[in-house]
Amino acid sequence: GNLRRQFRVDIQATQSGDRLILEENFLYDDGEQDRRVWQIDSQIIDGRTHYSGQAADITGKAIGKIAGNAMRWSYDISLILSGIELEVRFDDFIYQMTPDIAINRAYVSKWGMDIGSVTLVFLKDRLAEEKLPLDLKNW
């Protein structure tokens, strides 16, 4: 497929009781900015931790499960593409490679058919600050 857009995202996490709050600030290569705030809860079911999350542009709840160093995070989201609002499904597979690096491969679908994918590399704290400041001047 063709590369459509590139972006960087700065993610800040805070704990509020049993809830994890993730603040995502996006900066796209064309200068567009976006923001998403997740509220994520965990629950133990049959001895395994399951996650559910909500954000303003998420339809229903996101569902997540962890197995080993991998997490699957699935949700329906409303995106604006070429000026048209489109609800799509994201299936994220996030793999923790080291304590400071994770790789996310997200598959995007509509009506059960794949329409795209997103690959992200997450760098934690010091690594991210040294390598990739969230600034278009350093694109």
Predicted features, each with a name:
Residues 2-81, 93:
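Central antiparallel beta-sheet cores of small beta-barrel/beta-sandwich binding domains
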Residues 2-4, 86, 114-117:
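Beta-sandwich strand segments
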Residues 8, 12, 88, 108-110:
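Short, charge- and proline-biased low-complexity linear segments
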Residues 81-82, 113:
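Short, well-ordered, mixed-charge alpha-helical segments that flank or form enzyme active sites
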Residues 82-84, 98:
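Helix-driven interaction modules
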Residues 91-139:
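Glycine-rich, aromatic-bearing surface loops/beta-hairpins
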